[in-house]
Amino acid sequence: MIGRLRGSLAEKQPPHLVLDVNGVGYELEVPMTTLYRLPHVGETVTLHTHLVVREDAHLLYGFYEKRERELFRELIRLNGVGPKLALALMSGLEVDELVRCVQAQDTSALTRIPGVGKKTAERLLVELKDRFKAWESLPGTFTLVSNGPNQAEPVASAESDAVSALISLGYKPQEASKAVSAIKEKDLSSADLIRRALKGMG
């Protein structure tokens, strides 16, 4: 099991990235909450990882905080929740927001996530309630702030990456394109475009 990787961020194409560890490139898929915190390409970063082994592939998922990885592991233990839906949930809600949502048994926040209807949201909240009791006493919160100005990206490339990332989360291509196009601010990175688009669709 690969539990943690430290290396140079070689590529960043949401929601995927490549981490160069001593000359070996590890391809990882990350939630948007991790993407927002990543440094510039070429800089060093440490990610906590979870490996999913399938017959046809070995899939590696990366998380900026260990607590995010633990949440991911809790989510994929639930009936009907695979890595894709778990990443979508974590991309649409911060960890502490999801914990508060479970505490309050609030279905409205979950149903904004692609692929989560009312019945699914109700079932997830019931199943997560007991699992999250231990989380209430854990210190620390997640504040989604970037480590600094994002490296400049060509506008067309940033918008294309943002749309692709939203589609990978389960949004329809038209929804994703419309949400990104609706953002009026100029010269934003793909991470900032994704963040604003998700807020706009929430």
Curated annotation (Swiss-Prot):
The annotated region (Domain I) lies at 1-64
Q: Which InterPro entries match?
A: DNA_helicase_Holl-junc_RuvA_I, Hlx-hairpin-Hlx_DNA-bd_motif, NA-bd_OB-fold, RuvA, RuvA_2-like, RuvA_C, RuvA_C_sf
Q: Output the CDD domains linked to this UniProt entry.
A: UBA_RuvA_C (cd14332)
Q: Which cysteines are joined by disulfide bonds?
A: none
Q: Which UniProt keywords apply?
A: Cytoplasm, DNA damage, DNA recombination, DNA repair, DNA-binding
UniProt-annotated location(s): Cytoplasm
The organism's place on the tree of life at top rank: Bacteria
| Biological processes, Gene Ontology terms | DNA recombination; DNA repair
Q: What is the annotated signal peptide range for this record?
A: none
* Subunit description: Homotetramer. Forms an RuvA(8)-RuvB(12)-Holliday junction (HJ) complex. HJ DNA is sandwiched between 2 RuvA tetramers; dsDNA enters through RuvA and exits via RuvB. An RuvB hexamer assembles on each DNA strand where it exits the tetramer. Each RuvB hexamer is contacted by two RuvA subunits (via domain III) on 2 adjacent RuvB subunits; this complex drives branch migration. In the full resolvosome a probable DNA-RuvA(4)-RuvB(12)-RuvC(2) complex forms which resolves the HJ.
Written domain comment of the UniProt record: Has three domains with a flexible linker between the domains II and III and assumes an 'L' shape. Domain III is highly mobile and contacts RuvB.
- The protein, known as: Holliday junction branch migration complex subunit RuvA
Organism of derivation: Pseudomonas savastanoi pv. phaseolicola (strain 1448A / Race 6)
Gene name in the database record: ruvA
